[in-house]
Amino acid sequence: MKSFLNETKELVTSQGLIAVLAIVQVRIVATSLGPEDYGLIGIYLGIIALCFRILNSRNSDLVLINSKSTDKEFIKSAILFEIILGLVSCSAVYAIIFLFPSNNFFNFTSTPNYLFLFIFTRIFFNIFEVFRGILTYKGDMKTYSFVESFSNIVRFSFVVILISIDTSIKSFFYALSMHQLLVSLVIFILLLKNINKQKASISFVDYFKLSKLNFYKIRTDQGIGLIPTHLDVVIIGYFADFYSAGIYRIAKKLIDPINYLIVAFSPWMLNKINEDKRYNFKKLTFKILFPIAISLIIFYYFFGDTFIELIAGKEFSDSYIPMLILLVGFLSYFLTFWTRHFLFLNNLIFKHTIGRIINLFVFLITSPYLITNFGFNGIALAVSIAIIFQKIYEF
């Protein structure tokens, strides 16, 4: 336990700071805009995030594998690769928007400028995955944690400042756009400094050939899993209303600290498995993860309603039940988060992909019925049931 804390303290501190900033940001945005506008933001972010992350999510793993597979320098090629993927994703978002220009679901008849700017700046933010992969390979968790913290502090600051000046959805997306531009610039500079000029460089074509097989594996795995992750708010907005989307989104946001723990432990876990294929997961689960899970259950069950009122206000009090339902699913994933990393580094990622297909299938089958009958509680139930089915299969 002591060695675990020593090895993960920078990551845990970083993600702890990020979680606190995220919760405070939720309070500022949700209380300022109310459930309907907060739900609408979730719908916009869900569609945009899906289009980008379906090509970019976990590409840090691709960079990690490539670092082990070649002695040549490839950072410049990796940056170009991510920018091209960003352009493809950007085109996909615009295509979706233009396909439904007069659809009331988006609550606009023509695409606002703030969304165009946010989508455009998101292209460059893709290179963050290159940075994560390089530092995970080097085991430099201190710099990794510092940059993650810096990124979230910048985002928090821009959101707070612009929302305080003008309480609107427009201000929120302008803040996110400014954050993406500034952080992308910083990441770009840091990546250039990490280039080893003593090594021979790999061309973009050769980098693509090196990446192709593992890229397809990661994309299949991530693409399937991202649909319930990012479209849940969109689906509740479609089958119910923006108010229900807002209530559910608050429930999900307040459960997000569990994801921050997973993010904190993941680079460390990847590094450990990379060094020792026989790492003792049983000891990790029962001595570290399980006590954390019990503490979270006690907190959310006994103090969850107060937590919601403190963070989002009384108008979001309906978020308590969906929050508890989501807690069950999220903790199921937390206790077994290491399975994905073990399967990935042992060339068994296909099993995780099958697990995600099961997750997606269960989610798509159950969510329309459960939402129709139970509203925001129904979408939370669909998400948790899907996660549990996935984890049962992977075990």
How would you name each of these model-derived features?
Residues N6-I18, Y44, A49, R53-F100, ...:
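Membrane-water interface segments that mark the loop-to-transmembrane alpha-helix transition
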Residues Y38-G42, G46, L115, F242-K253, ...:
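Small-residue hotspots at the loop-to-helix junctions and early N-terminal turns
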Residues S3-S57, C90, Y94, F156, ...:
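Signature of the first transmembrane helix
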Residues E7-A22, E148-S151, R155, F172-L192, ...:
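Transmembrane helical elements of multi-pass membrane transporters/channels
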Residues E7-I18, K72-K76, L115-F120, L135-V160, ...:
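Alpha-helical transmembrane segments of multi-pass membrane transporters/permeases
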Residues R53-D71, T136-Y137, I255-R278, F342-L345:
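Helix-loop junctions and terminal segments of transmembrane helices
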Residues F100-F118, F302-F334:
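Interfacial segments at transmembrane-helix termini and the short loops linking adjacent helices
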Residues I43, P112, F116-I119, S145-I195, ...:
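Hydrophobic alpha-helical transmembrane segments
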